[in-house]
Amino acid sequence: MVVNCFETCRAIDFWNRRNQLNFPGIVRLEHHQVILKPFNGTWENSEKPENQRKNRYNIRCWDHNRVILKSGSGSTSNYIHANYVDGFEDDKKFIITQGPMEETCNDFWKAVWQNNCSIIVMLTPTKGTNGEELCYQYWSLNEDSNIITEDFVIETVNTSVRPTYILTTLRITDKISNDSRRISHYQYTEWPVDETPTNHVDFIKFIKIININRKKSGSNYQQQLLSPIVVHCSDGVKKTGIFCAVDISLNQLVLRKTVSLAKTAEKIRQQRHSTISTPDDYLILQPGYYVLLYLLYKILAIIKIKNCGEKKSRRKST
């Protein structure tokens, strides 16, 4: 029986859990407790007949924190399958959404524009292994070319292929005001469809890159409050939920030296329907935590060695 799985624990205590017998079984029992946690949310907007065609899959979208679009170009619909999700001590850090469809491409860019977003994280290829569409090609792959939607022109400025992701700089222009903004589009390429990230260390490094550039972007635009990061995969729940959970845990670990996996999973599920919905989703998080803890202890060890060296130098000088 798992006891107090929703309590926050010290990083060292979480680290020691790896030595427990039947560790995967314990994790699955924890996930079962997360799933059983009641939450009285509604999803009426996602099931309206006029909105169902905007849902890529038959997945609900919470009403209480959904992204509400402003009308434009004669459209009266304010619906997009997207929710605001909090980071660690960072309200509305993310906008989690599904992979855009051709029909919802303008809505996707409207959400980006209206929320002043400067970073998009894409965790899926556009096509599956059998050629099925997982995500519409909502930007141009060619530099100095663009796509045009009802409200926006999206130009591809440049593309840089990195070992684990592709960084594309985009320029979005509002067709009415003619105002433009730059968007950094990060497509992570080391997460195969229906599998786990190829390398947990690379995945964590990718998340750190996103966080660093979000802060830089806020400084460039002199924003007091950083704008949300748009995160999507294909269904907008599985990979995106894991991405946000690891990001939250990384920041909690660095800032508080504590871990609360069950609480994190519970909160994400209350803000984005169907996230971390299977025991395997929950289990995927565990190796990532161990890598985080390992890296943290390496950093602390380096700092400790450095401090000891400085103390010895002072003694010699005196």
UniProtKB/Swiss-Prot annotation:
Highest taxon, organism lineage: Viruses
Enzyme class: hydrolase
Active site: residue positions: C233
Keywords of this entry: Hydrolase, Protein phosphatase
One term of GO molecular function: protein tyrosine phosphatase activity
Domain Tyrosine-protein phosphatase: 26-292
Disulfide bridge map: none
Catalyzed chemical reaction(s): O-phospho-L-tyrosyl-[protein] + H2O = L-tyrosyl-[protein] + phosphate
Annotated SUPFAM superfamilies: (Phosphotyrosine protein) phosphatases II
Pfam families according to UniProt: Y_phosphatase
Alphabetical list of Gene3D superfamilies matching this protein: Protein tyrosine phosphatase superfamily (3.90.190.10)
InterPro entries the record matches: Prot-tyrosine_phosphatase-like, Protein-Tyr_Phosphatase, PTP_cat, Tyr_Pase_cat, Tyr_Pase_dom
Enzyme Commission designation: 3.1.3.48
Family the UniProt entry places it in: Belongs to the protein-tyrosine phosphatase family.
Protein name: Probable tyrosine phosphatase protein N1
